[in-house]
UniProtKB/Swiss-Prot annotation:
<feature type="region of interest" description="Reductase">
    <location>
        <begin position="147"/>
        <end position="396"/>
    </location>
</feature>
<dbReference type="InterPro" id="IPR000971">
    <property type="entry name" value="Globin"/>
</dbReference>
<feature type="domain" description="FAD-binding FR-type">
    <location>
        <begin position="150"/>
        <end position="255"/>
    </location>
</feature>
<keyword id="KW-0813">Transport</keyword>
<dbReference type="GO" id="GO:0071949">
    <property type="term" value="F:FAD binding"/>
</dbReference>
<comment type="function">
    <text>Is involved in NO detoxification in an aerobic process, termed nitric oxide dioxygenase (NOD) reaction that utilizes O(2) and NAD(P)H to convert NO to nitrate, which protects the bacterium from various noxious nitrogen compounds. Therefore, plays a central role in the inducible response to nitrosative stress.</text>
</comment>
<protein>
    <recommendedName>
        <fullName>Flavohemoprotein</fullName>
        <ecNumber>1.14.12.17</ecNumber>
    </recommendedName>
</protein>
<keyword id="KW-0560">Oxidoreductase</keyword>
<feature type="binding site">
    <location>
        <begin position="204"/>
        <end position="207"/>
    </location>
    <ligand>
        <name>FAD</name>
    </ligand>
</feature>
<feature type="site" description="Involved in heme-bound ligand stabilization and O-O bond activation">
    <location>
        <position position="29"/>
    </location>
</feature>
<dbReference type="GO" id="GO:0071500">
    <property type="term" value="P:cellular response to nitrosative stress"/>
</dbReference>
<dbReference type="InterPro" id="IPR001433">
    <property type="entry name" value="OxRdtase_FAD/NAD-bd"/>
</dbReference>
<feature type="site" description="Influences the redox potential of the prosthetic heme and FAD groups">
    <location>
        <position position="84"/>
    </location>
</feature>
<keyword id="KW-0216">Detoxification</keyword>
<keyword id="KW-0521">NADP</keyword>
<keyword id="KW-0479">Metal-binding</keyword>
<keyword id="KW-0349">Heme</keyword>
């Protein structure tokens, strides 16, 4: 526990942090990667270049300083980050490295004096221990469960299939032929790739797109403009190639009784965790209403269309609505899609305000914000909305 004097000192630095903004974390990351370049094998350097990770860390530091007297308010964020950390195989000793560079950054940018540095050192130590303990629990659970493992495990690509103009799916089986760990629908895999064309090892996380079967995993990857890993997987990876995976992780997953109505709402490649949820609902013989709402650019970018329709038909109360932002001439209204333009939900208010319905959202942040605002305006309680951001977390 932190004493009141330490808490007061940390809180007194909040205005300075807010004024500095993400320049603080830019300095931190530049310093850390200069002194500990081996950490480039863990961090997504694309997120460093576009500033997303720097912004996310800055927001996390400010949130911690603001809530330092109420750590319970941070527990959802701690769980989300701990799940990501364990997929990256973060170890306890790496927290010491991060802490050293954080304090050095504060000193180099602000020269706040030893009392402030000592207070932040204590505060960081408390938070680091929270993460270390939670991550240790996750590691033990992952390793000891049926089919589980620690670290990474080699898998073979047994099927590679183009699902749309921008999305390709990969089915992966363990090279040792042994069982693999089950997962919650909506969770993701971390894939570790080393290639001669890469400056560093690259780790990416991709949602699982099927229900657990104990034998294989399936992910789907969107080709990103200038994406290092997505470009490699689309253009270079072949069936028979070996990749290394961490066990499934993630705090965004379907967890409702079979009599609870659910809406699965996605934009673009955000449908991938929803697809895993849909297959699981079928596997569980879900009896309540299931709404599938999806927005795509057009028919060429719309993936898994037949699979979704066939899976939905096996559910007793399934309905779906598809939006194409800019339909092509070959896209058939009423068959390929039902609405054009953005996902406007007013016409579906009767279906969406079903009592006790839960809503799962995934897609671009602006898409999820747009949808969430509409749902909240309908009077839907915020606690019934669940969402996942691909990449560094942002508030919807």
């Amino acid at each position: 526990m932190l004493d009141n004097h330490t808490i007061a000192i940390v809180k007194s630095t909040i205005p300075l942090l807010a004024e500095t903004g993400p320049k603080l974390t830019a300095h931190f990351y530049d310093r850390m990667f200069t002194h500990n370049p081996e950490l480039k094998d863990i961090f997504n350097m694309s997120n460093q270049r576009n500033g997303d990770q720097r912004e996310a860390l800055f927001n996390a530091i400010c949130a911690y300083a603001t809530n330092i007297e109420n750590l319970a308010a941070l527990l959802p964020a701690v769980e989300r980050i701990a799940q990501k950390h364990t997929s990256f195989n973060i170890q306890a000793d790496q927290y010491q490295i991060v802490g050293n560079h954080l304090l050095a950054t504060l000193d180099e940018m602000f020269s706040p004096g030893q009392e402030v540095l000592d207070a932040w050192g204590k505060a960081y130590g408390v938070l680091a221990n929270v993460f270390i303990q939670r991550e240790d629990d996750i590691y033990r659970s992952t390793e000891t469960k049926t089919g589980g493992w620690s670290g990474v495990r080699p898998f073979r690509i047994v099927n590679k299939q183009l699902q749309s103009s921008v999305i390709t799916s990969f089915t992966l089986e363990p090279t040792d032929g042994q069982p693999i760990a089950d997962f919650q629908p909506g969770q993701y895999l971390a894939i570790y790739i080393k290639h001669d064309s890469f400056a560093n090892q690259e780790i990416r996380q991709y949602s699982l797109t099927h229900a657990p079967n104990g034998k294989s995993y399936r992910i789907a990857v969107k080709r990103e403009a200038q994406g290092t890993v997505s470009g490699y997987l689309h253009d270079t990876a072949r069936e028979g190639d070996i990749v290394h995976l961490a066990a499934p992780h993630g705090d965004f997953f379907l967890d409702i009784p079979t009599d609870t109505p659910v809406a699965l709402i996605s934009g673009g490649v955000g449908q991938t965790p929803m697809l895993g949820m849909l297959h699981t609902l079928k596997q569980q013989d879900h009896q309540a209403k299931v709404l599938w709402l999806h927005a795509a650019e057009n028919g060429t970018a719309h993936a898994f269309t037949d699979e979704i329709e066939q899976t939905g038909q096996a559910l007793p109360h399934f309905d779906h609505h598809i939006w194409y932002r800019e339909p092509q001439q070959t896209d058939r209204p009423g068959e390929d899609y039902h609405h054009s333009g953005l996902m406007q939900l007013a016409s579906l208010k009767g279906e969406l305000t079903t009592p006790d319905m839960h809503y799962y959202l995934c897609g671009p942040v602006v898409f999820m914000q747009f949808v969430a605002q509409q749902l909240l305006a309908m009077g839907i309680p915020a606690e019934q909305l669940h969402y996942e951001c691909f990449g560094p977390h942002k508030v919807v």
